[in-house]
Amino acid sequence: MPPIPHVRPENVLRRAEELIAVGQPAAALSVLHEHVTSKRSRSSPIASLEPVMLLFVELCVDLRKGKSAKDGLYQYKNIAQNTNVGTIEMVLKKFIELAEQKVTEAQAKADEIQSSLESAAPTSNVEDLDAIETPETILLATVSGEQSRDRTDRAVVTPWLKFLWETYRTVLEILKNNARLEVMYQATALQAFQFCLKYTRKTEFRRLCELLRNHVQNAAKYSAQMHAINLSDPDTLQRHLDTRFQQLNVAVELELWQEGFRSVEDIHTLLNLSKRQPKNIMMANYYEKLTKIFMVSDNYLFHAAAWNRYYNLLRQSAIALAAGQGSKKDSPSVTEADMTKAASFVLLSALSIPVISTSRSRGALVDVDEVRKNKNTRLTNLLGMPQPPTRASLFKDALNKGLLSRCRPEIRDLYNILEVDFHPLSICKKISPILKEIGADPEMEKYVLPLQQVILTRLFQQLSQVYESVELKFVHELAHFPEPFQVTSSMIEKFIMNGCKKGDLAIRVDHVSGVLTFESDIFSSAKALHPGSAAGSAESEVGSVQRLQSTPAEIARSQLARLAKTLHVTCMYVDPSYNQARIKAKEAAHARARAGAAKEHEETLTRRAIIEKRKEALSDALQKKQREEENRKRARNQQLQEAEQQRLLDEHRERERKRMKDEQDRIRQQELKKQLEELKTGVKGIDVNQIDLEELDSNRLRAIKLAQLEKEKNDLNEKIRITSKRIDHLERAFRREELKHLPEDYETQKKQDLETYEQTKEETLKAARQKHKEDVALKHRLSRLVPYFNDFKKSVTEKRHEEFERRRKAADREFEQKKKQRIKEVHERIRRERAEREAEEQRRREEEERIAREEQERIAKEEERRRALAEEKAAREEQRRKLDEQAIRQRQREEEAEQRRAARKAGLAEPRGPAREASPERTAPRLNLAGRTGTSWRDRQAAKAAASAGEQPAAAQEATPAPPAKAGSYLPPHLRATRDGPSDSRDLSHARESAAPPRQFSRSPVPPSGAPSSQEKPGPWRPRFKQQQ
């Protein structure tokens, strides 16, 4: 059956355009959405579906129907992803461009509204130019001045921003985990990042990052699907890395440090998966963003480590470029100024690392703190360092690479003051000019506060080595910093309390006497009593603090060690053999060490050779395995493609079959429902809900309808009969009873009507009097306004009249213009109709001539056919006549031959006996031998044949007897049968069969020539089928 209307994409597109033209875009969108999401559209060609999708996304954007767009785009992706990926990218790009265009238009509209409000505000509401700033205007500006822009944005721009965000999210969901659409996916993600950055959408940026993270996590889960992305592919992984680096940049720009840190973790995960070495420029950006993240999180140790890694990368890139081993495109541009700046930041960040712990709890004192350990391990892995960094290791690495010679002079002086020549009494005087220079630099200003913490820590550690107690005033004088970095007494006390709380310091503050007392319990195990240990600090190396002298606690703790050293020196002087034995043992140990080193060296060489061989074997095996894996993967992919093609073909066939079946079922159901609705509305008493549509057909429905109509007709007739009978009797009884009460009811009704009339009359008169009084009072009250009303009415009338005249003239002009245009259109239409009529008349004449010409040709062909049939019929008649004549002549010849054969038989059989004449068998010729008495065996056989010949049919007796042959004359061999015996009967039968059609002849004796024949003379010849009838 033909498809229903508007199934083809061209018809749907035409219908949607018609609906848009009449101002019904919602209906057009509904038509397009129904067609796009329909299963029938899967079999439509992509070239015809593409314009439909373009119009569909345009309407979705205009009407802000994000969900409808998502459904349609998902369906279109499933249809086109196996055939044409370019059309999917084009439609999605169009979708994003339209959404971005709407946002731009909304912004322009909001700016226009705001500018109009701002330009209209000073003039429209100002009544006195001398008093512009009235209390009312000030209050209005205070209440709504700053919020008008926000309200305008919320009403105009925000809905389109929300729709644009939904657009990006929808496109990313459609393109996710598809290798053929991967480039478009990455480009859309970058556009979404720019959207978040341009409009400062922090919440949407967090959701976008989480969405991309989920897509990468699900990539491994759906790796078995067709067109799934492969993160092992270097190009794919590089594109994901570029996206994550852009994500990190946007997170830093938006100051979303938590998202930035998660982005760093994502980048680190992808770098671990990558088999290709990442570009230096990317890693430089990576470490640079890490420095910002660690600085915001107050993690100065890993902030300095990130700067160290960044400087190392710049140094290696510069060395590689100088040696010509690297590409300038993949390496960051490095100048001497950049290296100096990076070196200064490396050293300054390392100096800013706190000497003591900066955590707010005492939990950092626990060395086995798993949380801190795990965190440091994660951060170390992010930086790509083999072990967690420390303050001392960072200084050591910086000194080994000569950063002191590269950094700025003030940073070098700061390092010497803090780490080389630290003097607590002159520290602030030396460091003040350096802090001023650092504070003047906006990028280095953030390091001033941690440097103050380091200086205070060094100061109190060295004071605790020299003094047991100091005055607060003395400490304040020592900790004097330049403005605006001045440290107050409260800040110093807060620092002391924080250090004591964490166990890094052991100081008591006496506010009464203004004295700081350092704890000196020699038997205490607190780490604060052992300055320089720095157990809770960022470094673990002992001796980072300059040792001035040993404290009593250290002296008590190292007493046994000092006693052991003294006894050892005494033994060396008292017993010289002890020293000699020690020297010999040392030399023997050195000899064993040299021998072991040589042997270990040989073993190392051997092991290295073995390892190289194993590496080569492993590399060969791995390459072989990779080749086999690639071959298997290629074969598997080919099988999957063939299976997928077969599956798609089967699915297409199944869909077509199912579509045809569903279409037939739908049409049948529609017809049945339509008939049921007609039955429901036309016939009462039928419960349509109880009828099963699956088991219903038109015949049963017709039978149900006829049965119900018959039932209704019978019920109606019965009701009419019963009702008519009841009404007749009841009405007669009512009227008889009513006659008794009619006069009384008439009098009562007349009295009630009179009373009602009087009451209504009185109420009407009273209401009229009251209304008249009120109207008179209103007239006197309003009469004063009549002159003003008349003046106003006159002015309004004049204005209306002028407006009327103006509009009437405009209408007249427009009427004349329309009239001329209408006249022109009518003339054009008449001319066009006349041309069409002439063309139609010409076409009709040509059609009539063509029909007449075809009729003549048909008549001529019919005459020719009849003439040919007549000739053919005459030829057949002539041939049939010739055949009949031939048959008659043949029959005559056969009859003559029969007569001659019969005559010959009759003439030759007379001198023979009856027994010999009746013998049907052929015998040998008689010999002239001596006679004998009795009958021979031939005579007996002839007698038997004669006896049996009487039972044969009489057909053989039809032949006419031939004249007898003369005695002694010659007879041919085929005519000797009747004279010498029946020996030639078979030859005669064979001759008859060859001369005429086969007939049945009798072998009975031929009667004499004078005997009458039992058969009449045969008539004319007839065909055999007529003879058989």
Swiss-Prot record:
Keyword Coiled coil: yes
Amino acid composition bias (Low complexity), ranges on this chain: 943-960
Annotated region described as Disordered, given as residue ranges: 621-666, 797-1029
Chief location: cytoplasm
Gene3D superfamilies to which the protein is assigned, alphabetical: 1.25.40.860, UVR domain
UniProt keyword annotations, A-Z: Coiled coil, Cytoplasm, Initiation factor, Protein biosynthesis, RNA-binding
GO biological process, any: translation reinitiation
PROSITE patterns according to UniProt: PCI
Cellular-component GO terms for this entry: eukaryotic 43S preinitiation complex; eukaryotic 48S preinitiation complex; eukaryotic translation initiation factor 3 complex, eIF3e; eukaryotic translation initiation factor 3 complex, eIF3m; multi-eIF complex
Stretches of the chain forming a coiled coil according to its record: 92-121, 606-903
UniProt family annotation: Belongs to the eIF-3 subunit A family.
Full protein name: Eukaryotic translation initiation factor 3 subunit A
Lineage of producing organism: Eukaryota, Fungi, Dikarya, Ascomycota, Pezizomycotina
